[in-house]
């Protein structure tokens, strides 16, 4: 069965809403534990103003420490995606990421003006204009980039977000050179039928670009949404170790879907991820101890039924 790629965003989206700021060395240890478990892609942080998001302070130091410890920030996965990425909200963030050695970055905006204003102090259209300008610099510098579309399934401020608006943003992003589109359910508003419909539309309209789904489990629909997306052809998913995460600019944006719970789901479906579930659960236990609290992920508490990828042949005959 065709493999899926899991992008662990715990070092960025997972930690950015935590009350305590972890030292760069601790965040590097988190990244290395994810790598040791076989996680193929990791979002190492975001190049944002540390006064606004203090949890991301020292991201340039993290990149430097990874290089010093022998990690190649230009390394690629078996399906030719860059192993390391980071979020950049603007031109300055991109310049810092490029100077730190990143070869892939994720630009971010919201599909709704309400969330985009809360996060970036501008409308979605204004963010797209800025992206068009500095995408030229990204391509000139030989880097690649994706565009993360927040509030793709609904906005905590504006409510309904039309699929046509999301599609138009995704197509514009591809037109300016994006090689990845990340559809984000920022506050966990989506339901499976909605996810399947939008993912199918985006896959049909931009078939040659990686489409990644970024889900929050705010209302306990995250894993059903992931399964619905997989059924229509999504093969790349963001998730966060332990199910931690949230957005400081979006009310109630709690909890990414947990990497270990998602791996367990795919193991049971017979879908390879390349990730060692036991090692991932151990990493989650370490993160729980580091943060000093239980984490939302469940498979480590209950114990896995599917510690490895299983054959679905008995169920399909």
Curated annotation (Swiss-Prot):
Cofactor section: Mn(2+); Co(2+); Ni(2+); Mg(2+)
Catalytic activity reported: (3R)-citramalyl-CoA = pyruvate + acetyl-CoA
pH-dependent activity: Optimum pH is 7 (at 55 degrees Celsius).
Any single GO BP term: glyoxylate catabolic process
Protein activity control: Activated by dithioerythritol (DTE) (in vitro).
Active site: 247
Conditions for induction: Under autotrophic growth conditions.
Cofactor note: Divalent cations such as manganese, cobalt, nickel and magnesium.
Location of the Pyruvate carboxyltransferase domain: 4-281
Pfam families: HMGL-like
Binding-site list for a divalent metal cation: 13, 214, 216, 256
Enzyme class name: lyase
Keyword terms, alphabetized: Lyase, Magnesium, Metal-binding, Pyruvate, Transferase
Record note on temperature dependence: Optimum temperature is 55 degrees Celsius.
Gene3D superfamilies, sorted: Aldolase class I
CDD domains linked to this entry: DRE_TIM_HMGL (cd07938)
Role this protein plays: Involved in the glyoxylate assimilation cycle used to regenerate acetyl-CoA and produce pyruvate as universal precursor for biosynthesis. Catalyzes the cleavage of (R)-citramalyl-CoA to yield acetyl-CoA and pyruvate.
Oligomeric form and interacting partners: Homodimer.
Similarity annotation: Belongs to the HMG-CoA lyase family.
Protein name, entry field: (R)-citramalyl-CoA lyase
Originating organism: Chloroflexus aurantiacus (strain ATCC 29366 / DSM 635 / J-10-fl)
């Amino acid at each position: 069965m065709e493999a899926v790629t899991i992008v662990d965003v715990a070092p960025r989206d997972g930690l950015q809403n935590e009350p305590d700021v972890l030292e760069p060395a601790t965040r590097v240890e988190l990244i290395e534990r994810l790598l040791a478990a076989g996680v193929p892609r990791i979002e190492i942080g975001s190049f944002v103003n540390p006064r606004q998001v203090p949890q991301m302070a020292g991201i340039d130091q993290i990149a430097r420490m990874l290089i010093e410890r022998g990690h190649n920030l230009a390394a690629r996965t078996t399906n030719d995606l860059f192993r390391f990425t980071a979020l950049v909200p603007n031109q300055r963030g991109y310049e810092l990421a490029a100077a730190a050695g990143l070869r892939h970055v994720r630009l971010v905006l919201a599909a709704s003006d309400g969330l985009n204003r809360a996060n970036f102090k501008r409308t979605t259209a204004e963010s797209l204009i800025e992206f068009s300008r500095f995408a030229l610099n990204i391509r000139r510098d030989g880097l690649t980039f994706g565009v993360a579309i927040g509030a793709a399934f609904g906005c905590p401020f504006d409510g309904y977000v039309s699929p046509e608006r999301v599609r138009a943003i995704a197509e514009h992003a591809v037109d300016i050179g994006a090689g990845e589109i990340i559809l984000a359910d920022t506050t966990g508003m989506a339901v499976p039928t909605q996810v399947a419909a939008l993912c199918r539309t985006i896959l049909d309209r931009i078939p040659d670009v990686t489409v990644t789904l970024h889900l929050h489990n705010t209302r306990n629909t995250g894993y059903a949404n992931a399964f619905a997306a997989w059924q229509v052809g999504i093969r790349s998913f963001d998730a966060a170790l332990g199910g931690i995460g949230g957005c400081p600019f979006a009310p109630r944006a709690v909890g990414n879907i947990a990497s270990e719970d998602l791996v367990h789901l795919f193991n049971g479906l017979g879908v390879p991820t390349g990730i060692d579930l036991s090692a991932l659960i151990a990493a989650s236990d370490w993160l729980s101890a580091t943060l000093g609290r239980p984490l939302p992920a469940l498979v480590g508490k209950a114990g896995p039924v599917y510690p490895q990828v299983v054959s679905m042949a008995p169920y399909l005959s």
